[in-house]
């Protein structure tokens, strides 16, 4: 037992004086030093006894074990109706994904609409207007830069004022950006500025929404409820496509101002709905609002404040947060030097979020109408709706696959599926789409084949990488550094989103459907990376994930790892930490 653990005497009382440092996150640090905190060892040696912060001792270990048994029995007796309230609350938080998806779905159509091109495009010598590749790329992609900045900067509002208030604030910022876009008359840079500001808001949403869902939801439903965020994104994309289809025949600004006006309406709806959502109990415990935390837990789990479930969860929160307080506040440097294995975990989050973009999803979602116009379709808006339907329906399957098959299996099999789809899609586009040259009509059969495999690709993406990337990063970090780590990971997602969105018009002009081979190569790399570096987090609490990293479990054996609190006497920990097999056999053969 570490000095830090010995120092802990029990949970905080509601009357305890508690720091409101916005960077205080939970980490079971064992015997390790908390890097980035000056003089940690001296501070620990001279630390006041925890009894100076609290007024009663926590339950003995045997009482906690009995409490855990009572909680397990309580969970077994819970019906689906008992989880209805927390599910509805998480859906309301996940509605932030709908706001993001709506923007993605509508902008893909705006760049093909006549009034939008007339107002914000350039004029040729013959008087016709057009959107250049540069201007199109900037107006589409700058949103992602705003998101990257918002994810890092505005996500701190969740640490300072709570996840709930922080989320409502970033939605207001998003609304301001939408108002600026609607008010644009004929200056493309005004619309451009509005896109940046709305991106700031969405960047904050993408960090705070999954964070709040994962901290409010019961662990047995956490993967499913966090996946609802991605479900809402796909629903927003689909309805955005439908709205563009409904307004495309107008000849004035109704084409694009009506979809933008609905963006504003959705943001107002979310702000109102958020008033009914409970605050994160983890955050409330951290800032010393113990009674509020109990009420939030009881409300979310549809039980009483003195129930075994609430008592056990509060003890877990208070013990780990008090231990973290003695270690000091986290610095940004701790994402690199922290323990257990914080650099590896930070890098893993950055890689997973980057690779999610490098699957090529935004190639289809941002430029779907443009792509299928090139395939030879007369009404590419209709095909965009088909893609939107496939995306939305497929995401329903993810609510099952994420918790049924686990995070690793979803990512690995998702890579395999998308690789196969890209091979066919790109090969047909390169060799069969224009049998008589690009200046001649395209082959209808080849075009239809490409659409079918684009739909297969979207199914593979929507059931695997789309939701799992968010679920995985929400489960991989201790509360102590969670906000910082998630914001860095999300920023990587947005930066790659910007690069892909901006350069896609230029790349497709140069190499056309060879572009599919680029994404295929990224998925081959992703398969190997996930296999060797991404551990399974299914069914684990945030504290148990920390313990897994402390014990140096091999990622490809992490599915066999059992937390210390659940182990039997015959459990072999070394079997999960060592693998004598040659490198190539680890991936392609089962261990005997």
Swiss-Prot record:
GO terms (BP aspect): carbohydrate transport; D-glucose transmembrane transport; hexose transmembrane transport
Summary of the function given for this chain in its UniProt record: Probable glucose transporter.
Keyword terms, alphabetized: Glycoprotein, Isopeptide bond, Membrane, Repeat, Sugar transport, Transmembrane, Transmembrane helix, Transport, Ubl conjugation
Location of the protein in the cell: Membrane
Carbohydrate attachment residues: 126, 249
Similarity field: Belongs to the major facilitator superfamily. Sugar transporter (TC 2.A.1.1) family.
Extracellular side: 103-137, 186-195, 244-257, 379-384, 431-452, 512
Signal peptide: none
Protein name: Probable glucose transporter HXT5
Any GO MF annotation of the entry: mannose transmembrane transporter activity
Region named Disordered: 1-43, 49-68
Annotated GO CC locations: cell periphery; plasma membrane
Coiled coil: none
Primary localization: membrane
Cytoplasmic compartment residues: 1-81, 159-164, 217-222, 279-361, 403-409, 474-490, 534-592
Biased composition (Polar residues): 16-35
PROSITE patterns the record matches: MFS (PS50850), SUGAR_TRANSPORT_1 (PS00216), SUGAR_TRANSPORT_2 (PS00217)
Sequence intervals crossing the membrane: 82-102, 138-158, 165-185, 196-216, 223-243, 258-278, 362-378, 385-402, 410-430, 453-473, 491-511, 513-533
Topology in membrane: Multi-pass membrane protein
Keyword Transmembrane helix found: yes
Keyword Glycoprotein in annotation: yes
Compositionally biased tracts (Basic and acidic residues): 58-68
Residues in cross-link Glycyl lysine isopeptide (Lys-Gly) (interchain with G-Cter in ubiquitin): 61
Further facts: Glucose transport is thought to be mediated by two kinetically distinct systems, a glucose-repressible high-affinity system and a constitutive low-affinity system.
